[in-house]
Design a protein with these regions (language model features):
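A broad, low-specificity signal for short, low-complexity segments enriched in glycine/proline
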Residues: 1, 46-51, 88-92
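Conserved ATP-binding N-box helix of the HATPase_c
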Residues: 1-25, 75-82
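Hydrophobic (often cysteine-bearing) scaffold residues that line and stabilize catalytic clefts
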Residues: 4, 46, 139
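Alpha-helical scaffold elements adjacent to nucleotide-binding pockets in ATP/GTP-utilizing enzyme cores
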Residues: 7, 49-56, 81-82, 142-146
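Solvent-exposed, well-ordered amphipathic alpha-helical segments
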Residues: 8, 12, 32-37, 85, ...
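Conserved beta-strand-loop-beta-strand hairpin that lines the nucleotide-binding pocket
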Residues: 12-65, 99, 105-107
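GHKL-type ATPase core
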Residues: 65-169
Length: 171
């Protein structure tokens, strides 16, 4: 599933940009919790960054570096290929801000700021996507294959006994 790949690679890029060596965190969906969560510990995003990156197709902050995976400005919108909304939690300079990215009635992507509060959490971004019950196992099997290729393996939560396939890392 593209959403898992795109947001996980964006999280890896956020760590690369910020010089962070810790793994990204991924919570896989299960029948008990129908949410996919991908959390990075990069620099976080300001409100202006959120609007520019998530609301406009082709907008990318990564074109000036060859060390980053993404550069086309499409991956941050990939959740719209799966559903009509998703949540963005940005942890930026001591503030957690929650946004809802959604497709409006005219089929245009919009960003709504839902809440903002002081936070002691480390900077970064968390993407939360509601998942169909029938897709839970597909996300788990996709994660097993995808994350095998990551040099720094993500911390995976949400499922018991998660194991990676054995292959040579690409990222």
């Amino acid at each position: 599933l593209a959403v898992l790949r795109e947001y996980s690679c964006n999280a890896v890029d956020a760590h690369t940009e910020a010089g962070v060596n810790r793994p990204i965190e991924v919570t896989l969906p299960s029948r008990l919790s129908l949410e996919l969560k991908i959390r990075d510990y990069g620099m976080g995003l300001s409100e202006q960054d959120i609007q520019e990156i998530y609301a406009f197709y082709g907008e990318s902050t990564k074109r000036k570096s060859n060390s980053l995976i993404g550069q086309l400005g499409l991956g941050s919108k990939s959740a719209f290929a799966y559903g009509d909304n998703f949540v963005i939690n940005s942890f930026h300079n001591g503030v957690k801000t929650t946004y809802n990215a959604y497709i409006d009635p005219s089929q245009i992507g919009q960003i709504a700021k839902l809440a903002s509060a002081s936070s002691n959490e480390a900077n970064g971004v968390e993407i939360v996507i509601s998942v169909k019950p029938s897709d839970c196992e597909t996300f788990v099997s996709t994660a097993r294959t995808l994350f095998t290729h990551f040099k720094v393996k993500p911390i995976v939560r949400g499922v018991a006994d998660f194991t990676y396939e054995t292959r040579t890392p690409l990222y």
